[in-house]
Amino acid sequence: MLMFTKGPKALAFVAVIGAGVLLAGVSGRAQLASERFSMVKAMTFDVFGTVVDWRSSLISEGQALSTRFGFEVDWAQFADDWRGGYGPAMQRVRSGELPWMRIDDLHRMILDDLIPKHGLTPLGEEDRDNFNRAWHRLQPWPDSVSGLTRLKTRFVLSTLSNGNVALLVNMAKHSGLPWDVVLSSELAKHYKPDPEVYLTAADLLGLEPEEVMMVAAHKGDLRAAAALGLKTAYVPRPTEYGPDREIDITPDPTFDIVATDFNDLADKLGIR
């Protein structure tokens, strides 16, 4: 039987014991997670919004144009409009209205439509092309590089984005993203969340779907992956659409892991 007396030393002893129990609990949970996902060999990542902050990056690129040309443009609205055209443009391809197109080409099509609406007609072809390549220069979230570097010590890391291969390779070089491989919906000639994208990725990695974990900030992406047997990690990015827009980040209980960022994801998988 242990006897405790009141006083500073006794309280300090209890605090130390309590901290030890807490650390043991955290370590134990990480160990259980590590064992639970021992079959996972690779992690595939959504990129736009999950790994990189597209909105702030596009705003910054637009502001640079304003400095050069004197444009008076609401660049936050422009970024939202550019991104907002992405889904409808993909649907036009899916419906057969448009032939298969790389995301670079879809982005340019949307940009050409937005230019007169936002008073950017003075932009010449070279500047338009360079502005379209802003999507190749998107900046990562603060935790992305450090978290991916930790996850890379255990898993094969790959993109799995609707962005085309050249875009993703250039982005990785620009932002120092430590991918082992760059996979894209372009390789399946489908866009997420079509099943072909996820299954093609697993096949190219030489893995079964259950040996792959899809990581994304978007629930629809994860639900589509889970339906095919992939493991799922939900990493919400509450400010993806700006600080003033509220988005539902309530996790789906069917997701295998929920993390606040990539370093938290590494912690929960027992990676130090």
Show the residue positions of the predicted features.
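Asp-based, Mg2+/Mn2+-dependent phosphohydrolase catalytic module
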Residues: M3-K6, Q31-V40, T149, G163-R272
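Bacterial N-terminal signal peptides that target proteins for export
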Residues: M1-A15
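Active-site neighborhood of HAD-like aspartate-dependent phosphohydrolases
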Residues: E35-G84, K117
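Bacterial N-terminal signal peptides
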Residues: A12-A24
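Generic structural signal for small/hydrophobic residues in well-ordered secondary structure
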Residues: D46-G49, L111, T159, A225
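A metal-dependent, Asp-based hydrolase signature
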Residues: F69-G70, A79-D129
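Substrate-recognition element of Asp-dependent hydrolases with the DxDx(T/V) motif
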Residues: E125-H174, V182-S185
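Sec/Tat signal peptide C-region and signal peptidase I cleavage site
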Residues: V26-R29
